[in-house]
Amino acid sequence: MRPLRLLAALVAIGLFAIGCGWSPPGPAPTSTQACGSTDAPSPEVVSQAIAGLPQAQWKESARGNTPDCRLNWVVVTAGDASDSPMQVLFFDRNNPLGPATPEPRTYINVISTGNDTAQVQYQWRQGQDPACCPTGIGTVRFQVGEDGKIKSLDPIPNP
């Protein structure tokens, strides 16, 4: 009887995990080790960019760069919950380019998708999605334009 209960519990946990949202796997974030310190934004420049965001207790949660070392990003979050506001700040080496969107979003992930392009994955809750498991998903590619400004190559999803 005991093994049957254990099996039933494992099946229930597995079904719950399968039904709790989906996030496609992406490549590992790029490393800043391939680029020199002059290719990345300084701590002071990052702090100034964070200071320009809406008032919150922002803290860095991730950073990366494209293989050509020009486009850098810093992801900041305003909390520890899975649905806390987040923002992506872009930099052309040590020059701030601004955030990916005017307003913070939740459930953001950034990956490098080409030599000079970063892809931001946005997720959002739909219907009765629990906070842990958003099912809405969209991606936007960003790169530094010829004018030196950040530009999106795809429409930004509007949840």
Q: Where does each model-flagged region fall?
A:
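Bacterial N-terminal signal peptides that target proteins for export
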Residues: 1-10
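Residue-level signal for mature regions of secreted extracellular proteins and peptides
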Residues: 13, 28, 125-126
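C-terminal motif of bacterial Sec signal peptides marking the signal peptidase cleavage site
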Residues: 16-19
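Bacterial signal peptide processing site
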Residues: 21-23
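Extracytoplasmic low-complexity, Pro/Thr/Ser/Ala/Gly-rich segments
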Residues: 26-83, 157-159
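Short, flexible beta-strand-to-coil junctions
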Residues: 75-86, 91-95, 123-126
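Extracytosolic low-complexity repeat regions of secreted or lipid-anchored proteins
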Residues: 92-153
